[in-house]
Amino acid sequence: MLSLKKYLTEGLLQFTILLSLIGVRVDVDTYLTSQLPPLREIILGPSSAYTQTQFHNLRNTLDGYGIHPKSIDLDNYFTARRLLSQVRALDRFQVPTTEVNAWLVHRDPEGSVSGSQPNSGLALESSSGLQDVTGPDNGVRESETEQGFGEDLEDLGAVAPPVSGDLTKEDIDLIDILWRQDIDLGAGREVFDYSHRQKEQDVEKELRDGGEQDTWAGEGAEALARNLLVDGETGESFPAQVPSGEDQTALSLEECLRLLEATCPFGENAEFPADISSITEAVPSESEPPALQNNLLSPLLAGTESPFDLEQQWQDLMSIMEMQAMEVNTSASEILYSAPPGDPLSTNYSLAPNTPINQNVSPHQASLGGCSQDFLLFSPEVESLPVASSSTLLPLAPSNSTSLNSTFGSTNLTGLFFPPQLNGTANDTAGPELPDPLGGLLDEAMLDEISLMDLAIEEGFNPVQASQLEEEFDSDSGLSLDSSHSPSSLSSSEGSSSSSSSSSSSSSSASSSASSSFSEEGAVGYSSDSETLDLEEAEGAVGYQPEYSKFCRMSYQDPAQLSCLPYLEHVGHNHTYNMAPSALDSADLPPPSALKKGSKEKLADFLDKQMSRDEHRARAMKIPFTNDKIINLPVEEFNELLSKYQLSEAQLSLIRDIRRRGKNKMAAQNCRKRKLDTILNLERDVEDLQRDKARLLREKVEFLRSLRQMKQKVQSLYQEVFGRLRDENGRPYSPSQYALQYAGDGSVLLIPRTMADQQARRQERKPKDRRK
């Protein structure tokens, strides 16, 4: 009903509604299920009961297709389409659905026709065989006199339309002939009766809870039915010619592997060099389960496939891949490493101990094949073959092995994203290290993205220079940790450690004051007008203008700020860190004395940039005392200081200007301080007033509450006194005519209501007259 509801036209619905309004009962289910096979043929095509299928010649297109083009079973006869659908479904998890068919072997009863049809022409020959018991409505239909035939015949043959009791002999003979012909062709009740198939599902659910004996019997009968073919002309059953399971298995595995190869092509250096034929020969066909062999049989066999076939095929393919990967791994490990019996690396990991890719980085070997990163998780040692076999790579020195990031600087991205356990930061002299399972993924995904070849040309560094840096500054926590190696490669990872590196690389007080000016952004902290005025003088001493790097942050792209760092001149620019030590150019390295002298000059230039304009002018005029004394000394001491030295007019005028500007600055600071103190005092006064206001509001609320309570008490007292008053006759006074009035001396008078109202009006007018 639900599957065919959308095909009903609007006119049919309107006609049904009209009939229901008139009072005629319309049973739509009978028209949509078993009573209308033509409607189902229009929608789904003719069923197999009416189609003469060529069982012996399915592929012969000269006589027409064996299956109707509109049949829903057409897809099962195309092997390529079925295999493609199975291969595409390998990466999806499918919950298997079990179907259990139970068969009961018994003899048919002699009276196979119900009592309403006494004619013996409809009775079939009773013989022992397999009878489907999936019809749950045997008892119901036998009691219905409208059904002209028994349930036994309905299960074995087609469904006849409901007939009355006045059938002629010709009609009964025609029905008998058609019925026998349908039974001979193999068309049962389930082909025609749609509601019968719906009821079969309910019966199957009940039969699933049965014993194991019925289940095995049902599977055997189903297998027997699948192995039998029915002749279209004679209706005879004969066993099917099943091809050998070995050929079918090998052919299907070849097709699956070929489809996998087309979906995920391997590179030139594939991890699986063996061909497909050798793989299929290595796997014995006898080890295939029966479910897989049944699934790989010819599509001529009918029946439902096992729900575990796809899962079993996927497991077989994965086992083949693992076997071949194990062959490659064992051959590689025999060449590279022969482990002793007690080696923990061989017992725990079964891998050859290779050098991690972070220690021997070669830009030419950083890229992998097209599909290598998918299989890298299964065999990580395959990727390490070209790295471990290359003898031209230079390992790090033991003094620098504690921090590999000092060797590569910003190019070693693994130190920025992964902990030291995965980065391979252990000492090289400690022994063989564990392989890095993420090295290949990082090399292909990260190093290709940042163009490692360009970095090797622009920003490389030398391990020998790193060792000299460590000897120069007597600390491996200063410049060896993420420090800059060239003015153009100052990256964001070095900005966070610039304060620590600058403070630990020198021991003098001037260096500590210089380190305090660094922020986390890596630039100088205080900027004044003296920096812009003295840039030209400083550039002459530096002699180098660094170029901007594509990895440099915007805050680092000031050449004046980069040139003032004292340790940048020791950084060489020889980018051949993959070469041997003999190939290094020693002419680029200055002597240690020149390095120390240059560092002092750089430090002096850096301190010069931190001085103000007046300090630079005082140094240029060679004034013998500091600006602090000029500004902060009292008048008497200042005059004595000037009298001790022989100063020129220009020097005296400069000293007076410095003192005047310093005093003005101090006066301005004092003025700002007084203003701030005044503002703070006003804020405190405002807070005090707000507290007083809140206190007065609370008191007002208390007064109003007490006044309200007093009025209530006076009102109650007034009513009590007025109720006790009596006239001469002993009657109480009326509240509408009389009222009580309080006198100034405390006495209470009883007056008429009109007089009391007049006095109240006069008292109200007095405040108004005063306001005017």
From Swiss-Prot:
Q: Where is the composition biased (Low complexity)?
A: 476-523
**Motif location (Nuclear localization signal)?**
761-768
What biological process terms from GO does the record include? Answer: cholesterol metabolic process
Residue ranges of the region described as Cholesterol recognition/amino acid consensus (CRAC) region: 191-199
The bZIP domain sits at 654-717
| Region ranges (Leucine-zipper) | 682-696
Instruction: Give me the glycosylation sites of this protein.
Output: 348, 412, 423
Task: List, alphabetically, the Gene3D superfamilies matched.
Answer: Transcription factor, Skn-1-like, DNA-binding domain (1.10.880.10)
Q: Which residues carry this modification: Phosphoserine?
A: 528, 599
* Region annotated Basic motif, chain positions: 656-675
For this chain, one GO molecular function annotation is: RNA polymerase II cis-regulatory region sequence-specific DNA binding
**What Gene Ontology cellular component terms go with this record?**
endoplasmic reticulum membrane; nucleus
Cross-referenced PROSITE patterns: BZIP (PS50217), BZIP_BASIC (PS00036)
Spans of biased composition, class Basic residues?
A: 763-772
Q: Where is this region: Disordered?
A: 108-148, 470-532, 753-772
Question: Where does the record place Polar residues bias?
Answer: 113-131
Question: Which residues does the annotation list for site: Cleavage?
Answer: 103-104
Disulphide connectivity of cysteines: none
Q: Transmembrane segments in this chain: where?
A: 7-24
The family note in this entry says: Belongs to the bZIP family. CNC subfamily.
Q: What is this protein called?
A: Endoplasmic reticulum membrane sensor NFE2L1
UniProt source species: Pongo abelii (Sumatran orangutan)
In the UniProt record, what gene is named as encoding this protein? Answer: NFE2L1
